[in-house]
A protein has these predicted regions:
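Cytosolic regulatory regions built on CNB/CRP/Popeye-like sensor folds
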Residues: 1-170
């Protein structure tokens, strides 16, 4: 893992696309608020196979994927892949509980890591409405993740039923 300084070149490059197409957690933030929020995070670089988050470890931070591709693994089972713009571990703001899955870099990857303490300090210095927007964005992100999980469960249930029917016909 290579960490870059707060004003590293990677940070400047990553901000432009974020400002033009904000990730779900930053939607309805002003451009100034987005820039201020991004300044709270630390840039970290990973290469293929690096573990970004480990299942079971303390979840006192979240990551914004600014470059690359990561895979999510639970009990050695591939759950999904996430691309640039994805937030990982966004529930850290409510409760720094244990990580529920491994997050692995599938290629050269860059994240902005936000600690719970620094993020809460950031929102304490801002108008309360910004924190409320952030919380609504977390709820929206969670809803999208739940909908995606529902779809995956439905597909797996269909495959299971087809497999059972195939076994019964033999």
């Amino acid at each position: 893992v290579e960490q870059l300084g707060k004003n590293g070149q990677m940070r400047i490059e990553s901000e432009e696309w974020i400002l033009q197409d904000p990730p779900v957690l930053l939607q309805n933030f002003s451009e100034e608020d987005i820039r201020d929020f991004l300044a709270v995070g630390d840039v970290e670089k990973f290469t293929l196979g690096d573990l970004i988050m480990r299942e079971g470890e303390s979840g006192n931070s979240a990551c914004l994927l600014t470059k690359g591709l990561v895979s999510i693994w639970k009990n050695n089972i591939h759950i999904t892949n996430l691309e640039r713009g994805s937030f990982i571990g966004e529930m850290f703001i409510f409760n720094p509980s244990k990580r529920i899955a491994n997050v692995v870099a599938e290629e050269d990857t860059v994240v902005l890591r936000f600690t719970r303490k620094r993020t809460l300090d950031f929102f304490r210095k801002k108008p309360e409405r910004l924190f409320k927007i952030f919380i609504i964005n977390i709820v929206n992100l969670q809803q999208k993740k739940i909908a995606a999980m529902d779809e995956k469960i439905s597909q797996l249930q269909q495959k299971l039923l087809q497999a059972e029917q195939g076994t019964q016909q033999r």
